Structure formats: C-alpha cells, structure tokens
Amino acid sequence: YDKAIELNPDEPETYNLRGVTKYNLDDHDGAIGDYTKAIALDPSNPVYFDNRALSKTEKQDYAGAVEDYSSSIELYPTDPETYYQRAMVKVSMNNKYDACLDFKKAEELGSTEAKAEIKKNCK
C-alpha cells in the first residue's frame, strides 16, 4: 500500500485499505491515522468513519468511536450495523439508555443481533 500511496497520494481507498491491514495487525494508532487521511480526502464515505470507530473502540476511546459512528449515521442513516456498533460502544460506556435507543433503531432496520442485545441490556 505504501507504493500505491506514493504513486497516487490522493486516493482515499488506498489509505482505508492500509488502515484495515494495520487494524488487523493491532496497530490501531496507525490505522486511525490512515482512516483519518481517507476521511480528509473523502468525507462522504461512511465506511471510513466506521473503520476508524472500530480502531478507536479497540483503544477504548469510546467517545471518539461514538462520534465517528454518529458521523457515519449522518451519511448513511439506514445501516443497521452502524447503529448496532454504536450501541455496543455505549454499553461499554455504561450508557444503556442511549444504547437501547440505538439497538432498537438497529432492530427496526433489520439487525437480528440487536434483538438479543435488547433482551440483555434494555429493561
């Protein structure tokens, strides 16, 4: 990916893919840097925000992860997985009320995973 970036430094997807590789190698700081560059080049792609949120979650930067998931939802408000993932982060933050709102929205949009989490976390 380094060579591809050298040849075409304005291609956001290359940064995203390198970020995914770094994420898989547990280099979350490096991944966040690459996702941030991808977002700077193309702030309209919700996947870049989702991916950065995953790395932020791994680093326990829960507030940052929620912010990125929220940005993704603004761009693509019908993706149940993003609501589900944001809810899981909110559970980690011990914010079950808001998590339950997201789980319910995820379920409404078709997430089967959310249904089990609603039973577990939402009373």
Go through the PLM ranges and name each one.
Residues 1-123:
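Alpha-helical tetratricopeptide repeat
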